[in-house]
Amino acid sequence: MGTLYEVLVPKFHLLEIDRTRRHVRCQTYTDSERMYGGPKDRTYGCEKGLGLDNLLLLTDSYKVTHFKQYPPGTKTICSYFESRGGRHVDINFFGLQYFLKRYLCGVVVTTEKIDEAQAIYTAHFPDALFPRDKWEYIVENHGGKLPVEICAVPEGLTLPYKNVLMTVENTDPECFWLTNYLETLLVQVWYPMTVASNSRVQKKVCFDALKATSDCDLTNPFSWMFMLNDLYV
């Protein structure tokens, strides 16, 4: 298993795996250093206003019931993420570090968030389907940190389709259900990956056209790097 690599943005720290307690963690960074944090007052009808900061709510609702559907005796779930294909010959892997540092690092499960999630999921389906005890286990035994290990290829790497880009695996046998609970959040990396992949191809088109039709000094990146107005972001 590899390590998680640092996104090439100033002041973002390398995300590491805590091998002693087997949690996802990262070095301390301030709110002002977060990218795309978004407004903090966005809520979804909850009195306490936790909204998008509540990891328990950042999943497809049907996944809340999956803990009941695994075979008895399941201890470990390891899932992988890949790009199955697209319009180009390869893909640029980019964006995972933001989601890890924004949503998964540090203490992300609290009694307050469990209460909020239970209220919402109880309104959605019978209370017995919400595994409150399993989330409380994470609070009591892991201090609210997620007992999962996430490994990935380096941010910014371009590679062919049908390669494993990241893996997710639980590190506590009692939390085998957590691996795929995180899928909904982690697959949001498709958007920055798509932007990065398309931009890379478009940038190459500009470069090749200049090389074939102009006498620009292409060793100077300023002669061509501003040609692409990328509006994806």
What spans do the regions from the language model cover?
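Residue-identity detector for glycine
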Residues: 2, 37-38
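Buried, small/hydrophobic-residue-enriched core segments of structured protein domains
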Residues: 4, 8, 12, 46-75, ...
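Intrinsic disorder/low-complexity segments
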Residues: 11-13, 19, 24, 30, ...
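Low-complexity, highly charged intrinsically disordered N-terminal segments
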Residues: 77-130
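Glycine-rich, N-terminal phosphate-binding loop and its surrounding beta-alpha-beta segment
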Residues: 108-168
